[in-house]
Amino acid sequence: MAFAGILKDEDVAAALKDCAAADSFNYKNFFAKVGLSAKSPDDIKKAFFVIDQDKSGFIEEDELKLFLQNFSAGARALTDAETKAFLSAGDSDGDGKIGVDEFALLVKA
C-alpha cells in the first residue's frame, strides 16, 4: 500500500466506503476519516508525493480524478463535478493544479 506507515488500512477502507457512490466525495470528510488531517506536515508531504503520480511537483486534474485509486486500486474515479470542486478548493493561486503547500492547506482545512 502506498500509504503504509502514514495511514491505517482500516481508516482508508472506512473512508473509501463512505464515498463509494458517485458524487459523494467530500475532501474534508475524506482527509479526516483517513486520519491525514491529524498528521504531521512531513506525513502530509509524503502523501502529496504519492498522489503526484507523474512527479511534476503538482497534483493536476487528471491525477485528482484518480485520487481515490491512490488509496485502493479498486476504488472509483471521481466524477467530473467532484474533480472540479476538489481542484477549485485546493488551487489557491489559480494555476490549474495543486502544489505541495496548497495540498497541506487543503488537508488541514
Swiss-Prot record:
Keyword tags: Calcium, Metal-binding, Muscle protein, Repeat
Gene3D superfamilies found in the cross-reference section: EF-hand
Gene Ontology MF terms in the entry: calcium ion binding
Disulfide bonds: none
Segments forming domain EF-hand: 39-74, 78-109
SUPFAM superfamilies to which the protein is assigned, alphabetical: EF-hand
Primary role: In muscle, parvalbumin is thought to be involved in relaxation after contraction. It binds two calcium ions.
CDD domains, per the entry: EFh_parvalbumin_beta
Organism field: Danio rerio
Annotated Ca(2+) 2 binding sites: D91, D93, D95, K97, E102
Name of this protein: Parvalbumin-2
Pfam families noted in UniProt: EF-hand_7 (PF13499)
Residue sites binding Ca(2+) 1 per the record: D52, D54, S56, F58, E60, E63
Family as reported in the entry's similarity comment: Belongs to the parvalbumin family.
One cellular-component annotation, GO: cytoplasm
Keyword Metal-binding in record: yes
